[in-house]
Amino acid sequence: MELLKPLSDFFKAIENDYRISITHIGIYVALLQFRAGQGFVNPIQAYRYEIMDLAKIASPKTYYKCMRELNEYGYIIYKSTRKRNQGSTIFFVDQ
């Protein structure tokens, strides 16, 4: 059950947050899945296309918008790198 705690905490945190859409949820869950594949490290380093594939999102514009909003709303800390050879850094915030 401990593996589900970050997801459960996220759903509790967004319960009354009208700003969060299904796309935000999909991206956050994809980030958690990616993190699990990396050994639950915090922060993770990920390329946009890796998270977009997991979240089933086709538009980079949608991805960047939702990542920026998740950062602004305090659910993650997103440090974007515009370098092609380095993934962005994403910190998970304890809810």
Where are these regions (language model features)?
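Winged helix-turn-helix DNA-binding recognition segment
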Residues: 35-93
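Short recognition helix of helix-turn-helix/winged-helix DNA-binding domains
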Residues: 1-54
